Every structure is written in structure tokens, then in C-alpha cells.
Amino acid sequence: MLDLAPLARFGGRVATGLLDVTSDPEALDSTGFWAVAADFEGRLTCARFGDVRPEPVPAPVPGAWHGPATDAWTSSLDRVAYTAGVHRIREHIAAGEVYQANLCRVLSAPVAPDADVDVLTALLARGNPAPYAGTIRLPGHGVEISTASPELFLRRTGRVVESGPIKGTGRTEADLLQKDYAENVMIVDLVRNDLGRVCATGTVTVPDLCVVEKHPGLVHLVSTVRGELPTDAGWPELLTAAFPPGSVTGAPKSSALRIIDALETAPRGPYCGGIGWVDADRGTGELAVGIRTFWIDRADGMLRFGTGAGITWGSDPEGEWRETELKASRLLAVASGAYDVSGGALS
């Protein structure tokens, strides 16, 4: 493994000079600039950096990233197991246990010992640009993440907080179904409830509902939920109320989490967690939902990537499998060197 220095890269800034690392969310209301990685299963890593400066994502260096072969990826759930899981969730819905649940699978492939997630971030910035893209590289703490997330989990500006749940995916707007719009509204209601647990009474609003956003290779339905924190609430209370993100769990959240645990065969890790930064000095921060996200598992020598879909009563099992393939295909191609980041797929 390379001797890689700790680094974080988000929003046109790079952070170096690691000062300290903690799992205590209260640190995010203290001082300094923090990189934040919260695994879906609850492990929180907050890293404070001393040197933060403007820097665009560098251009990819040819040959710097040695990704896995395109046929090296394996899935924690194959097509048969995944579609069976969709059927099982529909049975839970019919029984009245849940209205919606997100079923995910984790893809894995061997990674070179010299792999650097920040180099992968440079490739993704060209091949799959995303509003919440970034890097967290903390090799000594088991956190090496490259994300091309399109989804806002939590943004905080002073006391104002905002979430931007995504539900509904298609190749084009014409592919979006009534099921997608209904699912988005359902998750918006869940996120409203989550923020309502911590925000001041009467401050939670929905400024935007089911807006179509275009992203590389697909479109999403995106909504905005906003609220205002009372003076006695900060990051610990906000994360307790809202984590894990509602758009990647289901509704009701507690029932969906139980069903997910029974059906999924691999931990999600950073996938579907929260990834981003907090500037405690300015009272600002931005955490993405950890989708479209790669991470390196050094213990197993694997590069991992998660993909999933929200399952409702109206779901078609094969259609949901295809949605997971659509979400993954472009990014896996970039990571495997099968996608020319300056143009398109390589022959």
C-alpha cells in the first residue's frame, strides 16, 4: 500500500494536515474544518484538518489509477436473490408492515495495493460529475472513500437545515412512472418527520417537490425539505433524528431497517451513509447520502460500490434489478477503465 497522507476534498476545497480524529459528533459543533464519514451501520468518523484551501479536482493522470477488470466485479446479491428480495418486500407491504423499503447490494472487485481514492475522484469528476462529489482519505483509520453522490442528506447554514431526498430514477424523464412520484412523496413525508423531531415546531417546509434533475446517464426526482434548529440543538441531535437517511431506508424507517437487515447479505458501510464536511467555525456543513460511492477495504484488498432501488407495492422485480444496473453501470465503467472520461465508452 502506498504511504498516502490524510486528505479530504469537497466543493472545490482540499483539506490536509490532519489534526485529530474522533467518533464524537459533538466535535462538529466545536471548532475547525471536519471531514465526516458515517457508515450506514452507525460508525462515525470525524477528521479535523488544519490546512484548508481552494483547489479544483485535478485532471486525471493517465495510468495513475489501476482499476479492476470489468468482469472482476461480484455482487452480494445476484439477480435471482435480488428479485426474490423484491418479492419478499412486496409481501411485507401486503402484510401492512412497511410501505416502502430500499433493497441494496454491494459490488466488490480486487483492487491494486497502490490504489488511491483521490485519483479515482479525479476520474469520476470527468466521467460522472456530481454535485456532492469528494474524497475522504484516512488510511490509518480505515476510511478511503471516493464519492460521486448526487443526493444531499443534510446541509446546515447556521440554524437552517435542508435535505434533498432523491426517489425516482430513469434514463429520461419519460421513463419516470407514477410509482416514482408516489415513492418520492412518501419519502418526503418521512424526511419531514425526521427533521420535525429536531427542528423548531412549525419550521419544517417543503419548498420543492418532485423536481426532475438531470445527471450523467439518467434523471432523478428530487425534493427539498427545510427546517430550523432550536438554539439547544446541534449536529448530535440532528444526526440522531435523521440518520440513516430516509431515502435509502424506507417507510416506516424502523420496519424498513428490520427488513433490510434480514434480506441484505453484506454490510453497506459508507454506502447509504453520510459523507461530507463541516466547518464548525462558520456553522456550515454539507453531508451527502453515500450513494454512487466507492470505498477501499484494505483488509480484503477490495474496491466496493453499492447500488440499490426503492421497493413499493408497484415494483416490478426485474425492473428494480435493471434500475440497480443503470445506477451502477457508468461508474463501474469509469472505475474499471472502460469509460473514456473525455468522451464515452471505450470499444
Where on the chain are the PLM-derived regions?
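Extended alpha-helical targeting/anchoring segments
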Residues: 1-347
